[in-house]
Amino acid sequence: MQKEQRKFTEKTRRDLESGCNVTIVAFGDSITAGYAVRRGFPYFWKEALALKYPEARVEMINAGISGDTTMDGQSRLDWAVLSYEPDLVTINFGINDSVLGLGLEEFEMNFVDMVRRIRAGPGSEILLMSSQPLETPPYDRLVLDYYQAVRRVATQMNVGFVDVYFAWMEKVREGTPLGSLILPGLDHPNEAGYRIIAEELMKLF
C-alpha cells in the first residue's frame, strides 16, 4: 500500500533528495494542530525528514485548528494553505464533521472542493489522511465511515491517502494498548500516538 502511495510524493522526494527548500502545509483540525501536547505529528515528521534529508531545508507549517470541520477548511484554504505555495499539503478532517452530523455526501464534496482548489494553485502534491481510532466504540464506528469517505475521495481525485487508522490498529494488534496512545478521556493522540502518524507519513519518503 505504501509503495503504491509513494507516487504521490515523487516530486517532493526528488526536491528533498536534491537538497532543495521544501514547504509542507499540514492542514486540518485538532489532530493536526496537536491538542494538549507539546509536539504533534508535524513536529515529529519534520524531525524525521531532517534526519533522512539533511541537505534539504523543510519548512513545516502547522495549519491545524482545533474544532475545525471541512467547511471551516474550505473557508480558510486560501490564506492557510494556498498563500504559502506549498510543495506538499496534507489534509486531515473528519472527527468534528462526524460529531456535528455533517452528511457523508457533503463531507466528500467538501474534500473534493479543497483538492480541486489546491490543484488549481502552484502544483502542490496532496496527501489525504484518516485519523486515529476512538476509544468509545459507537463513535469509532461512526468516524470510520468518514475515514472511508476520505479514502474514496483520494481514489476519485488521484491523490495520496495515508491510513492513520490502519497504522494505529496494526500497533494495537501487535499488543500496544490503544489507551497508551491517547490522552486520558480526550480521544486525541498523545506524543506516542503522534509518532505513529509521523512514521506512517515517512513510509512515503
Question: Where do the model's predicted regions map?
Answer:
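Serine-esterase "nucleophile elbow" of acetyl-processing enzymes
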Residues: M1-S66, M71, R76-E85
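Alpha-helical cap/lid subdomain in secreted, periplasmic
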Residues: K7, E47-A56, M71-F205
